[in-house]
């Protein structure tokens, strides 16, 4: 296979096709259905998903919940305004954060948020400029304070404020720790999930805490040189068993989102099968890399030259993926986190 370059994954996207808010209701988003068997493209609506699934199929969703991790505070005693974005828990109440203005927040800097019932102290600055910060609060959990003072860390291309923070959570989100939503799951409603279960489609959960590295552009010209960011994942005993049983019975395992996909493929690559496990993964799926677990994928339309469009190309084929994206632009699909979905089966 020839060396793949970043520019191979470029496509032209008119700005107005970048969705600024989610579809309402959630399952009213459009769904492009791509067949791996005959290369056909169908244009549907997300709530039509049951038409393409069969009893025995297993959907694997990522139950990670987004932290309202962007908090604006004032430095003590100067009163200068600053912002922290919590990236990941280091230990206890110490978090790795992105700080603005970073240069002015050296170790020992104290910051106060809201009514002062949440404070933070900068412990140290890392090589990449990120800070280790310890938080102090008067509630049982830090999350209660973030809920009170924090905002959702929306991707940079979404400029509209959310009417409701829950619009950026999946309906099944429960494990706190993501810096961005696993967006393919935003299209599911409780009713649609009930319909799927009633027809014999299984729904199993994994956890992968999405890091902001998700939005980090690929810098290298040759994509195989790109180093992926690391993210924490976990697969339970029950989910592992259901996946093994689905495969053994000859049914399909369909990942809901690139994060579920990467979780399953990381575990399969590491252990040779899916078993209960947790750890960090920096798996990078791009054309030429073999898939060992999933049979299908539900995902949104991703940024040009992103690792996510590379993942889709790895599963569906490079030429076919880029063609599908051209069709999506021509058909005026909505793109990125709040946009429409694609089903590859």
PLM-predicted stretches and their roles:
Residues 2-345:
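Surface-exposed, charge/polar-rich loops and edge strands
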